Amino acid sequence: MGKPILLLPLGLSLLMSSLLALQCFRCESLDSTGLCRVGRRICQTYPDEICAWVVVTTRDGKFVYGNQSCAECIGTTVEHGSLIISTNCCSATPFCNMVHP
């Protein structure tokens, strides 16, 4: 009789963590229009993760690369040679990491 009682808190804990998780778009390679060309999926965040997307452009604004994921994320923009790498984060709503070039 003790085992079912012990399993109840574990089940409730798993249910709560899945309810609190955020769903995000996951794509290994976006094109310049924001469409996923490789690896289109949905991911669910783990603790400390949020929805993220990275866009790489040239200094004159030409699109080079983009991706979407669930990740630990800090929004930054970094210049590396002739490229600008923008890391963006969101957690307000599910699938908030949709890319609109």
UniProtKB/Swiss-Prot annotation:
Residues 1-21 form the signal peptide. Residues 22-99 form the UPAR/Ly6 domain. Keywords: Disulfide bond, Glycoprotein, Secreted, Signal. It comes from the Eukaryota. Disulfide bonds join 24-51, 27-36, 43-70, 73-89, 90-96. InterPro entries: LY6_UPA_recep-like (IPR016054). It is found in: Secreted. Glycans are attached at residue 67. N-glycosylated. GO terms for cellular component: extracellular region. This is Urinary protein 1. It comes from Rattus norvegicus.
